[in-house]
């Protein structure tokens, strides 16, 4: 035996060889000349094992190469390994070999290794081998069935890819030696092949022939040439193996299959000829090499094992000779293929109608698309080469994005070939994370590419609006981009221009990669290329020395003009991840040269402290930003990146099913506000319009028109549908209606059409459980599978629709039901992938359209729909769900008259803005016309992440109720109703978001409640017809007490709801409460005058109820106190800044309810749910003075709620905060008076991310924080005392205590006694306070983002004149220690959607920034730049009591707290403020401002009521004129209480004491005018 063989076998650890088997190789006959070629070996190649079986063949499908990625470092080390098993081996057409798979997924490649199952006997086949062999030898059929018909050579004694465990050096040596033998024995064959390959590539390379008109075929053509070049290079380098030829053949067959499947062009014949030529060129060398490498001994043992297995499996009968004849094919039917073809033909469509249809469809699909097929809607964005427009296909009504590239630009820049590359890549790519193209065509001046429209804008705009992204959001976006990149790289595509601008966000919140204008097409991935030398070659694939891309994202090797390849994309990915997490790129400079210098030489700067990145993220970015492309993560393939620890818990296969944190909310189907048009930088609209370029343009441009298979599919399906349903002309928006058609054969098609295109729906289609619904869902699912871009309408799964009992009427509080889209005529976008998730609306009796038509100042066409005249929804309304998502910005603006509001008699449909949460509901007949539990939660929504749902503008956090009882009327006997209710938390699935519900905890035996039929354990849904879910406990108690001696309670059995009882939440401290919006009816305002004084006291309670005694005065009338400890407000963690304070109704609207203060919570605060009380960041503490306490304007206006900014809260009750500046108004009393406004459109605010959600890393916020640190020193030495909780605290002491907790300060407790600020001796500016509705929760008090020493810009005259005739307003100025004046916008509040001309609006926007999550900030910030701000709203203004008399404005007090300063004169007739001890307390009640007298004395009844302006005020008040409510004494106001705003409603006139009002002899004469 030769020494070399012994050396090779010495490492082979196989103890149980049968005797003599080790020496079998040496006894085999070999010629002497072959031995001399390979040293002293007895084999034609290097030593090889006696059997393939020790080789690494997967024992299960999981081990098979198709599921294995060779890039795993663990399985693909370049370290030396044992060489005993010199031959790698696998069967030729082994089903699990990885070749039958899609080549691009051949990242997943062979895992054949020589190092596993060494314990097996040499000739013992594995289960997989036996299965394959029995199939191969046991039947006359080819083995190709499992591989989709792909055929491979009959026997392949070698594996098809590199053994992962083998060292490349020894492997390459083996290949080189084999090639040496091969060339020596067959010199002519090798030379012939190389020469033919050279001629082939030269003759057919894309530069030598006209580009193919079909994008798919053009891409395949390019790949064929690349494969031929690669084969030529490998042959010259002596690296060719049989395995390589096998893979080359497989890839060519795969490309050919793609060509046939995905192209309808006649050019397929050209591609077929190319493939055939290339296969013929390589066929002879491949055969010779296979013969040279053939090992008969291996084959013999293989055959033995197969025969044995076949006999055991009864595949071989006893008649062996007949079996052999059959195996040789001598008994085969000569015409099986013909028969098979006939069968196929007969299996097709035999009916003439179907034949005609298919013919028509194919002819339709062949019709070339052109510019006339599309209507341009608007510009989406501009770029360097052209512009992108939103267009709609005229026939299918489907929306697309059309990229128009100016031909002259391309010709002048010599970029025509690049346009074809982009077209080919977009057409060929079929991946959920890559934008798909539908067709391309040329016009006289442009090349046009029609792509899917991705609605959510790009990541660059998102970053610009919100700064750094939360880690989870960045991880998901990055991971989806990795998958897109992996797909492209497998097809040899290098993007070269990766940046956030090219990552688009779909309507479901996922990522799509776009813009391949700079991309290069290289060689598709080959598993045989996974060795060290090729990785280096791959990294230097392109040697064009082009420096192209966006400077901040260009890799060092491109800057240095070295060769580059796929690693340049991984460098850009590192920059992108850094930008996602930090908010800016790591390298920047004033010039590209300076920037490139940093890229090549500088280190990365990492944020530190609170803003430090997670360790895994930092490691990942560092690995991606390696200057050397060979060591850069991803150079060996995307698998290196995917297995990084940063993605440890990520499910790579379920990314698309993952709930996105940010889901775009579109105003309409044509909303492009998420995009930056960049019109300031680029302008392509009329460029080159004067020139006629058609004469001189290159001939290849005429080949640009193509139609992708996906467009053909969509177009033909829409045409087919349109044949079944006649079109009606498009009527005026809002007036056309589609009558319910009779049930017939077409209904099935119509149902499908509705699912695909979002056409208007017949009302009966939405009856629960009807076949139409099921059909709709099915068509949705098929559309989702078949299309790269699912329609918006198809994105919702109507999982909650099929149970009619779960549909109940919603509450009136959902303003969204007011807004209606017109029904689309049947010619409306069938293919409109904008398709609305169709939502039916019903409008009950008594609902007038007058209120609707005045809901907006300028209703958009199509926004309003004529109401149904009857209570049942006979007039169907298919409502655009995109409108509903943002409906709160388009409804009931501030000047809608209360009396014009529709009554509650008709149920309306609640829409959820959540993408997967709630869908359409059919209102049930409800005695109250509304139900709090009307939103059926689909199981998906219950388990979904609340973060994206929180960004929805309107949501009903209520479990589904299968049936409501009729209301139970309870007559009070004495002081008791005889039942106890309790508030419970109901969590949304697995999330930390909960809503508050109320159950009957106990019913007294023999009490009124029991007699009325109330049962313990029932869920209370309504009290007196008003839904109570989402109300906090005190609100429900108030609601019950307001009803006097009789209360109507509607309940439902607990088991009939979808609420399930589970274990206590461990992380309950992180919980966030979802609050609902309430809107009282107009009747309440009039009846409230007759309420008892008890309710007036409740009304006067201060803002934040102290839980332990919030209702202590009511214990005797209702046994509610015992339910408080169990209520959701009880037991908040000590670190919560609002521990033991409970927001009452209004804080729900301001999002200030006390919940999680956990800084770890990154769930965005929803406008509809209440924001958590975030701990105020320490760097932002010390702003002086604190934001003033919120007030609530009328609930009827609060459809849109802005959560209170986290900056407005103090970190803890024990921390000191500075006293307010001198120019403070009486009414403000140190606390924010914020007035949530009904937003007409998204408020134009740009907000930083709350620090509690993620450490803010945006540069803007850093600057803001550093500026605000100036205020910290001021607050450090100010006195701050612990808040006292006992009732015995005296009023003055109580006020003093509160100066340390201004955000929790009560208005009534500090009626104007502002303590002087010591050390601030500047002259005190007199402040005036504008009366009327105070809209903005943001613009009151000192601006939190304004530094101590900065002064506000002056208020413009336009701003002083409110549209409703409000009084002129002068912001008070306060002087800081530095001598600079700080102008504080205390009185001049504005509705947020009003565009102001001075700087105050910007400051208010800055404040608001912290109130929302980054996701919601993007919602609001984008609208200011898109120019789509809503119509300005007119604030409600209180009219004076008598003509000529102006309102008294409460004034701030100076150092002398016992006297009032002179008010700043507003007009000649403005009366002077009361002197002496008379003080006015400002209170907002039901949209009116009430000025009531001193706390101890009731007001004089000399107020003459006078109504407000008709369009602004409720109906005339008929209450007695003495309705000014005295402020209750301090003993009745708990330390944390506040007025229960909304329980009583006063006349407008009581808000304005007339001139000359006499109180205890103190007259208020009018001061002289200014």
From Swiss-Prot:
Tissue specificity note: Expressed in fetal brain.
Domain PDZ: 967-1055
Biased composition (Basic and acidic residues): 736-777, 1081-1090, 1276-1293, 1474-1489
Ranges for domain AGC-kinase C-terminal: 648-719
Basic residues: compositionally biased ranges: 1067-1080
Family per record: Belongs to the protein kinase superfamily. AGC Ser/Thr protein kinase family.
Protein name: Microtubule-associated serine/threonine-protein kinase 1
Originating species: Homo sapiens (Human)
Gene encoding the protein: MAST1
């Amino acid at each position: 035996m030769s020494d070399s063989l012994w050396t090779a076998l010495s490492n082979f650890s196989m103890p149980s060889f049968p005797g003599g088997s080790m020496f079998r190789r040496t006894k085999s006959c070999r010629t002497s000349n072959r031995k001399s070629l390979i040293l002293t070996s007895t084999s034609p190649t290097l030593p090889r094992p006696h059997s393939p079986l020790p080789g690494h063949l997967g024992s299960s499908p999981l081990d098979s190469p198709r599921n294995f990625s060779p890039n795993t470092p663990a399985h693909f080390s370049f370290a030396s390994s044992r060489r005993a098993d010199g031959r790698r081996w696998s069967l030729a057409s082994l089903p699990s070999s990885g070749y039958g798979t899609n080549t691009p997924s051949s990242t997943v490649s062979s895992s054949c290794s020589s190092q596993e199952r060494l314990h097996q006997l040499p000739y013992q086949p594995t289960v997989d081998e036996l299965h394959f062999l029995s199939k191969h030898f046991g039947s006359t059929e080819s083995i190709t069935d499992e591989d989709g018909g792909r055929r491979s050579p009959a026997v392949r004694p070698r594996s098809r890819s590199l053994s992962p465990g083998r060292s490349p050096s020894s492997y390459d040596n083996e290949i080189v030696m084999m090639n040496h033998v091969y060339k020596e024995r067959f010199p002519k064959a090798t030379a012939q092949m190389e020469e033919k390959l050279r001629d082939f590539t030269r003759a057919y390379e894309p530069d030598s022939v006209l580009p193919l008109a079909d994008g798919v075929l053009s891409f395949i053509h390019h790949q064929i040439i690349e494969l031929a070049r690669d084969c030529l290079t490998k042959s010259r380098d002596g690296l060719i193996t049989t395995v390589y030829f096998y893979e080359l053949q497989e890839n060519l067959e795969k490309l050919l299959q793609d060509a046939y499947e995905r192209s309808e062009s006649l050019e397929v014949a050209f591609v077929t000829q190319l493939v055939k030529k290339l296969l013929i060129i390589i066929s002879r060398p491949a055969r010779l090499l296979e013969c040279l490498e053939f090992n008969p001994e291996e084959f013999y043992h293989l055959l033995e094992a197969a025969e044995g297995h076949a006999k055991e499996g009864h595949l071989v009968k006893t008649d062996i000779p007949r079996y052999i004849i059959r195996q040789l094919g001598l008994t085969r039917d000569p015409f099986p293929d013909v028969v098979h073809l006939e069968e196929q033909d007969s299996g097709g469509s035999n009916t003439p109608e179907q034949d005609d249809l298919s013919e028509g469809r194919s002819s339709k699909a062949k019709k070339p698309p052109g510019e006339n097929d599309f209507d341009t809607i608007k510009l989406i964005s501009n770029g360097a080469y052209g512009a992108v427009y939103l267009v709609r296909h005229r026939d299918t009504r489907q929306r697309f994005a059309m990229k128009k590239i100016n031909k002259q630009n391309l010709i002048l820049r010599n970029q025509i070939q690049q346009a074809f590359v982009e077209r080919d890549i977009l057409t060929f790519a079929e991946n959920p994370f890559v934008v798909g193209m539908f067709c391309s065509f040329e016009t006289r001046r442009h090349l046009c590419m029609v792509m899917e429209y991705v609605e959510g804008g790009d990541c660059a705009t998102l970053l610009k609006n919100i700064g750094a992204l939360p880690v989870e959001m960045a991880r998901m976006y990055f991971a989806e981009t990795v998958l897109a990149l992996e797909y492209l790289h497998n097809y040899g595509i290098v993007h070269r221009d990766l940046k956030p601008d090219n990552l688009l966000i779909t309507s479901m919140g996922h990522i799509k990669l776009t813009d391949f204008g700079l991309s290069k097409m290289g060689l598709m991935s080959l598993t045989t290329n996974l060795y060290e030398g090729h990785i280096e070659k791959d990294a230097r694939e392109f040697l064009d020395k082009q420096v192209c891309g966006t400077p901040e994202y260009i890799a060092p090797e491109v800057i240095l003009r070295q060769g580059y390849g796929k690693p340049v994309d991984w460098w850009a990915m590192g920059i992108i991840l850094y930008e996602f997490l930090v908010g800016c790129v790591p390298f920047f400079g004033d010039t590209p040269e300076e920037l490139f210098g940093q890229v090549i030489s500088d280190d990365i700067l990492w944020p530190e402290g609170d803003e430090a990145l997670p360790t895994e993220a930092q490691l990942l970015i560092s690995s991606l930003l390696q200057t050397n492309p060979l060591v850069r993560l991803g150079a060996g393939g995307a698998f290196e990146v995917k297995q990084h620890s940063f993605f440890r818990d990520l499910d790579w296969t379920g990314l698309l099913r993952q709930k996105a944190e940010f889901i775009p909310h579109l105003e309409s189907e044509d909303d492009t506000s998420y995009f930056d048009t960049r019109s300031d930088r680029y302008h392509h609209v009329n460029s080159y319009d004067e020139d006629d370029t058609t004469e001189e343009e290159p001939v290849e441009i005429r080949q640009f028109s193509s139609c992708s298979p996906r467009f053909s599919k969509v177009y033909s399906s829409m045409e087919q549908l349109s044949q079944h349903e006649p079109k009606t002309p498009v009527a005026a928006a809002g007036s056309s209606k589609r009558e319910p058609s009779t049930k017939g054969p077409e209904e099935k098609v119509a149902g499908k059409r509705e699912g695909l295109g979002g056409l208007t729906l017949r009302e009966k289609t939405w009856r629960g459980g009807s076949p139409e619904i099921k059909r709709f869902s099915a068509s949705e699912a098929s559309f989702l599978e078949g299309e790269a871009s699912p329609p918006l309408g198809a994105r919702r799964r109507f999982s909650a629709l099929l149970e009619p009992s779960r549909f109940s009427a919603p509450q009136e509080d959902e303003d969204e039901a007011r807004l209606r889209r017109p029904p689309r005529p049947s010619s409306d976008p069938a293919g409109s992938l904008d398709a609305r998730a169709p939502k039916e609306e019903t409008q009950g009796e008594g609902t007038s359209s007058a209120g609707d038509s005045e809901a907006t100042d300028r209703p958009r066409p199509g926004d309003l729909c004529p109401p149904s005249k009857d209570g049942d929804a006979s007039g169907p309304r298919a409502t655009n769900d995109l409108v509903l998502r943002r409906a709160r910005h388009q409804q009931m603006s501030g000047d809608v008259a209360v009396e014009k509001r529709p009554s509650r008699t008709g149920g309306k449909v609640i829409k959820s803005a959540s993408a997967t949460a709630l869908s359409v509901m059919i209102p049930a007949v409800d005695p109250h016309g509304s139900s709090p539990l009307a939103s059926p939660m689909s199981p998906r929504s219950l388990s979904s992440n609340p973060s994206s749902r929180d960004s929805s503008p309107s949501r009903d956090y209520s479990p589904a109720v299968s049936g409501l009882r009729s209301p139970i009327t309870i007559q009070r006997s004495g002081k008791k109703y005889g039942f106890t209710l309790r508030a419970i938390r109901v969590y949304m699935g697995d999330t930390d978001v909960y809503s508050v519900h109320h159950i009957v905890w106990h019913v007294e035996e023999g009490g009124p409640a029991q007699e009325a039929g109330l049962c313990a354990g029932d869920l209370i849904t309504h009290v007196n017809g008003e839904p109570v879910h989402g109300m906090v406990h005190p609100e429900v108690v108030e609601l019950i007490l307001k009803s006097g001696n009789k209360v109507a309670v509607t309940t439902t059995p607990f088991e009939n709801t979808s609420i399930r009882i589970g274990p206590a939440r461990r992380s309950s401290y992180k919980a966030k409460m979802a609050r609902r919006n309430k809107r009282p009816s107009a009747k309440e305002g009039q009846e409230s005058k007759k309420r008892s004084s008890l309710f007036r006291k409740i009304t006067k309670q201060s803002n934040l109820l102290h839980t332990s005694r919030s209702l202590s005065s009511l214990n005797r009338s209702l046994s509610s106190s015992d339910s408080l400890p169990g209520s959701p407000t009880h037991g908040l963690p000590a670190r919560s800044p609002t521990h033991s304070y409970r927001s009452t109704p209004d804080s729900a609207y301001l999002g200030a309810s006390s919940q999680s203060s956990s800084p770890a919570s990154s769930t965005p605060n929803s406008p509809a749910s209440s924001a958590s009380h975030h701990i105020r960041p320490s760097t932002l503490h010390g702003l002086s003075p604190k934001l003033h306490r919120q007030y609530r304007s009328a609930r009827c206006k609060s459809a849109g709620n802005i959560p209170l900014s986290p900056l407005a809260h103090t970190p803890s009750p024990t921390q000191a905060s500075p006293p307010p500046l001198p120019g403070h108004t009486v009414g403000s009393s140190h606390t924010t008076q914020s007035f949530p406004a009904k937003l007409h459109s998204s408020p134009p605010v740009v907000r930083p991310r709350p620090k509690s959600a993620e450490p803010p890393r945006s540069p803007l916020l850093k600057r803001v924080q550093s500026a605000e640190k100036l205020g910290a020193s001021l607050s450090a030495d100010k006195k701050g005392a612990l808040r006292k909780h006992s009732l015995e605290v005296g009023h003055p002491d109580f006020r003093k205590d509160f100066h340390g907790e201004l955000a929790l300060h009560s208005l009534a407790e500090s009626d104007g006694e502002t303590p002087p600020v010591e050390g601030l001796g500047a002259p005190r500016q007199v402040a005036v306070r504008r009366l009327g509705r105070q809209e903005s929760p943001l613009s009151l008090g000192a601006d939190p983002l304004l530094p101590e020493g900065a002064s506000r810009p002056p208020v413009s005259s336009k701003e002083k004149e409110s549209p409703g005739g409000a009084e002129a307003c002068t912001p008070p100025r306060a002087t800081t220690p530095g001598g600079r004046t700080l102008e504080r916008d205390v009185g001049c509040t504005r509705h947020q959607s009003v565009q102001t001309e001075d700087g105050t609006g910007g400051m208010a926007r800055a404040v608001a920034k912290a109130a929302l999550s980054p996701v919601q900030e993007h919602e609001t910030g984008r609208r200011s730049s898109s120019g789509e701000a809503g119509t300005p709203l007119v604030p409600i203004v209180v009219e004076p009591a008598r003509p000529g008399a102006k309102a008294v404005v409460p004034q701030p007090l100076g150092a002398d707290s016992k006297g009032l300063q002179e008010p700043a004169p507003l007009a000649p007739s403005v009366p002077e403020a009361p002197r002496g001890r008379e003080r006015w307390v400002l209170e907002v009640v039901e949209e009116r401002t009430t000025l009531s007298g001193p706390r101890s004395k009731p007001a004089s009844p000399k107020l003459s009521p006078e109504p407000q302006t008709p369009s602004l005020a409720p109906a005339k008040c008929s209450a007695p004129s003495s309705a000014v409510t005295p402020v209750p004494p301090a003993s009745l106001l708990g330390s944390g209480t506040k007025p229960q705003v909304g329980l009583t409603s006063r006349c407008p006139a009581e808000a304005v004491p007339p001139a000359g009002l006499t109180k205890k002899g103190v007259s208020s004469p009018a001061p002289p005018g200014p």
